[in-house]
């Protein structure tokens, strides 16, 4: 992975993320009604006026925000190849703001459904921000824990050869 140029990492990761998102947003609604034809809305695949495909998109976007926060917390270097592949690539392809906008637009096609669509959009954004903050906090905590473990093992930073080794955690 370290040998690929960043554009290749983003391309490959984005393709993988988009395929995973598409799979989840197609197959989660099918779980609500296994007999349904793809794209057909039946009473079994609608919850509170929102199609299960849009619920699946909400899950995908919130999960993606959580994972991106976790990744950023664990790998602070934005140019790191793993962060480029997993963050910009996979999670960038996995989450979809444009699909969210289309879902809100489709849900607000009449005056009676504007409240449902608007609530869905605001709820998705709020949950995404909360999930990203939680992921970022968890990622930073995990990164700090790993740093402390390396320090306890004496492998955190190269030691100054002129300074005597004190042993143990610093």
From Swiss-Prot:
Transmembrane stretches, by residue range?
Answer: 8-28, 55-75, 84-104, 114-134
Q: Does the keyword Cell membrane apply?
A: yes
Any one Pfam family match given in the protein's UniProt record, by short name: CRCB
Keyword Metal-binding appears in the UniProt entry:
yes
Report membrane topology: Multi-pass membrane protein
Free-text activity regulation comment from the record: Na(+) is not transported, but it plays an essential structural role and its presence is essential for fluoride channel function.
* Name of the protein this chain belongs to: Fluoride-specific ion channel FluC 2
